[in-house]
From Swiss-Prot:
This is Methionine aminopeptidase. A divalent metal cation 2 binds at residues 104, 168, 202, 233. InterPro entries: Creatinase/aminopeptidase-like (IPR036005), Pept_M24 (IPR000994), Pept_M24_MAP (IPR001714), Pept_M24A_MAP1 (IPR002467). It comes from the Bacteria. Substrate binds at residues 76, 175. The keyword Acyltransferase does not apply. Removes the N-terminal methionine from nascent proteins. The N-terminal methionine is often cleaved when the second residue in the primary sequence is small and uncharged (Met-Ala-, Cys, Gly, Pro, Ser, Thr, or Val). Requires deformylation of the N(alpha)-formylated initiator methionine before it can be hydrolyzed. One of its GO terms (molecular function) is metalloaminopeptidase activity. HAMAP family: MetAP_1 (MF_01974). A divalent metal cation 1 binds at residues 93, 104, 233. Binds 2 divalent metal cations per subunit. Has a high-affinity and a low affinity metal-binding site. The true nature of the physiological cofactor is under debate. The enzyme is active with cobalt, zinc, manganese or divalent iron ions. Most likely, methionine aminopeptidases function as mononuclear Fe(2+)-metalloproteases under physiological conditions, and the catalytically relevant metal-binding site has been assigned to the histidine-containing high-affinity site. It comes from Staphylococcus epidermidis (strain ATCC 35984 / DSM 28319 / BCRC 17069 / CCUG 31568 / BM 3577 / RP62A). Belongs to the peptidase M24A family. Methionine aminopeptidase type 1 subfamily. GO terms for biological process: proteolysis.
Length: 251
């Protein structure tokens, strides 16, 4: 999507705020003893309160308001009976629509403290990779520079990127052009970012793996070697003044 009017911009900001509010409220509630279904109910209540609709349910008939992935799950984890424990690596991915406009956001974090420092490291480096990618976001620059920055950040920290999970265009649908915002450099991709373009940028940083495979059900993804993986995702509007993150709530 290319934002052309202030009405479109305000609509994107509104759904971005709602998704961010859901994400942050769910993260705050992720404590040992809670189930992923209970966390998902928080999203349901907040979506209803704000007049928004879960995109996974609306677009994909996904069996949950949000995707909650724990430890071996990398993405698209189904909320259910799974109980959260101290030291778990959790990813919460929230996407929704309101009045025909979408936002998509996600965060990975460690619950409490873990005796496995690599869990926290992949989370920290995912954040660093996203921040470095944002330095490349401006009209007229190559889309592939985002992936180059993400991959470089991973390598500098002796980590890897997941190559078959990518960002994407977003705005008037959950997935639209560009179809992929890679987490590595693709020299064949000559796509240029445009003023007002809306994209979801989501680095997936891993301890060892470079690809995910189907997991225990038709939705969840895992790595074959059970590597830890962390993701950070925001909906980003390309502007001449730099990236505008609709899913970031200012402190």
């Amino acid at each position: 999507m290319i934002v052309k009017t202030d009405e479109e911009l305000q609509a994107l900001k509104e759904i971005g705020y709602i998704c961010a509010k859901v994400r942050d409220t769910m993260k705050e509630a992720t404590k040992p003893g809670v189930t992923t279904r209970e966390l998902d109910h928080i999203a349901k209540d907040l979506f209803e309160e704000h007049g928004a609709i879960s995109a996974p349910i609306h677009d994909e008939n996904f069996p949950g308001q949000t995707c909650i992935s724990v430890n071996e799950e990398v993405a698209h984890g189904i909320p259910g009976k799974r109980v959260i424990h101290e030291g778990d690596l959790v990813n919460i991915d929230v996407s929704a629509l309101k009045n025909g406009y979408y936002a998509d956001t996600g965060i990975s974090f460690v619950v409490g403290k873990s005796d496995q420092p690599l869990k926290q490291k992949v989370c920290d480096v995912a954040t660093m990779a996203f921040e470095n990618a944002m330095k490349k976001v401006k009209p007229g620059t190559k889309l592939s520079n985002i992936g180059k920055a993400v991959h470089a950040t991973a390598r500098q920290n002796d980590l890897t990127v997941i190559k078959n999970l990518t960002g994407h265009g977003v705005g008037q649908s959950l997935h639209e052009a560009p179809n992929h915002v890679m987490n590595y450099f693709d020299p064949k991709d000559k796509t240029l970012l445009k003023e007002g373009q809306v994209i979801a940028v989501e680095p997936f940083i891993s301890t060892h793996a470079t690809f995910v495979t189907e997991g225990k059900n038709e939705w969840a993804f895992e790595t074959k070697d059970k590597s830890y993986v962390a993701q950070i995702e925001h909906t980003v509007i390309v502007t001449k003044d730099g990236p505008l993150l609709t899913t970031k709530i200012d402190d």
